[in-house]
Swiss-Prot record:
Catalytic activity: (2R)-3-phosphoglycerate + ATP = (2R)-3-phospho-glyceroyl phosphate + ADP
Pathway: Carbohydrate degradation; glycolysis; pyruvate from D-glyceraldehyde 3-phosphate: step 2/5
Molecular function terms from GO: ADP binding; ATP binding; phosphoglycerate kinase activity
GO biological process: one example: gluconeogenesis
Organism of derivation: Clavibacter michiganensis subsp. michiganensis (strain NCPPB 382)
EC number: 2.7.2.3
InterPro entries tied to this protein: Phosphoglycerate_kinase (IPR001576), Phosphoglycerate_kinase_CS (IPR015911), Phosphoglycerate_kinase_N (IPR015824), Phosphoglycerate_kinase_sf (IPR036043)
Name of the featured protein: Phosphoglycerate kinase
EC category name: transferase
Coiled-coil region: none
Subunit structure: Monomer.
Annotated binding of substrate, by residue: D22, L23, N24, R37, H60, L61, G62, R63, R119, R156
Length: 404
């Protein structure tokens, strides 16, 4: 069965449409650091407004542990959404209580309201299906139909993602549809050469995708904190750099499999090593197999790929027709250790085929480093969801919408 889309819901004029967005943006002291996920939701929300729907937006923000917490309120998000839509957006101070019911009741055709953070209710993320279903039914009372458009949460079995889609006539929004279209191009006969760039802190988070993609890619470039587990698997010492000892044997297996398949796993030849985790820490570029030979010795921290590696990665990326990147190459938040990530990002903007930035920290990195979204083929809104899709895992939030 194919994914159900909004067209399957019929005429939406005057109908209450609950839209599950992923508006989980970085927020500090009420200030939004990156509104990319809000902007990504605009296509679906604008289409529903133009169709005369009464739009009820729901989302989570952060991890408030199932209780109300002002620092995780969606109020600033609702205000920013209104600015981007160029329309008044109402805000309800609760999710399923009196404020939510009154705000939904007051909606006219084409109006929008944002309900308060779903995760102020522990039922949203409960492991108990019955508890989740009860919360979903409370949400369902506020709508006539349901549109799922939070791609970043479709890999989670949560009340607003899974059970709510069963409680009301449901369909996927345009954001989810576009995400799937791009990810399909990465898994179904991708144009070659096909390169995958993986970074980020933990190799354990990427093992599934490495295993699933090895038979499908031409080159796999490894950076970020995870590279040190690969270096250790090759017999090199890595100082005090991030290391997952329990994954070393698994990584050895992947290195052997890649060699058998003729897939290039490209590891850094040089790294930036510092004597502390701060922007003003003393640091230098050293060979990847000589990390403990720096003045910091066994206390040295590898915090970025080196310039030789960054240039080598960029050459491979620019020569590829399909590129998927997930995870920064270093601690890009600290200026001395941002160069590797910036070089890789710039190379992706020069790919003549399909370049995909895989959400999460990668999306935050390219924006923080000054790159406009439209310089890339696609910036995914789902870090974990896109990885699980590429692993070939079943995603409950898609299956409940008819996806197979």
């Amino acid at each position: 069965m194919a994914l159900r889309t909004i067209d399957s819901l019929g005429d939406l004029r005057g109908r209450r449409v609950i839209v599950r967005c992923d508006l989980n943006v970085p927020l500090k002291d009420g200030v939004i650091g990156d509104d990319g996920r809000i902007r990504a939701s605009l296509g679906t929300l604008t289409g529903l407004r133009e169709a005369g729907a009464r739009v009820v937006v729901i989302s989570h923000l952060g991890r408030p542990d199932g209780t109300p917490d002002d620092k995780y309120s969606l109020r600033p998000v609702a205000a920013r959404l209104g600015e981007l839509l160029g329309a008044d957006v109402a805000f309800a101070s609760d999710t399923v209580g009196d404020s939510a019911r009154a705000a939904v009741e007051a909606l006219g055709d084409g109006d929008v309201v944002v309900l308060e953070n779903l995760r102020f209710h522990a039922e949203e993320t409960s492991k108990d299906e019955t508890v989740r279903r009860g919360f979903a039914e409370s949400l369902a009372e506020l709508g006539d139909v349901f549109v799922s458009d939070g791609f970043g949460v479709v890999h989670r079995k949560q009340a607003s993602v899974f059970e709510l889609a069963s409680a009301l006539p449901s369909a996927a929004g345009s954001l989810i549809a576009s995400e799937l279209e791009v990810l399909d191009r990465l898994t179904e006969n991708p144009e070659r050469p096909y390169t995958v760039v993986l970074g980020g802190s933990k190799v354990s988070d990427k093992l599934g995708v490495i295993g699933h993609l090895l038979p499908r890619v031409d080159s796999l470039l490894i950076g970020g904190g995870m590279l040190f587990t690969f270096l250790k698997a090759q017999g090199h010492e890595v100082g005090a750099s991030l290391l997952e000892e329990d994954q070393v044997e698994t990584v050895k297996g992947y290195l052997a499999e890649a060699e058998e398949r003729g897939v290039k796993i490209v590891l850094p030849t040089d790294v930036v090593v510092a004597d502390g985790f701060s922007a003003d820490a003393a640091h230098e570029v050293t060979r990847a197999d000589a990390i403990e030979g720096t003045p910091a010795g066994a206390k040295g921290l590898g915090l970025d790929i080196g310039p030789e590696t960054a240039d080598a990665f960029a050459t491979i990326i620019r020569g590829s027709t399909t590129v998927f990147w997930n995870g920064p190459m270093g601690v890009f938040e600290l200026e001395p250790f941002a160069a590797g990530t910036k070089t890789v990002a710039d190379a992706l903007t020069r790919v003549e085929g399909l370049s995909v930035v895989g959400g999460g920290d990668s999306a935050a990195a390219v924006r923080a480093l000054g790159f406009d979204d439209d310089r890339f083929g696609h910036i995914s809104t789902g870090g974990g969801a896109s990885l699980e899709f590429l692993e070939g895992k079943r995603l409950p939030g898609l299956e409940v919408l008819g996806w197979q």
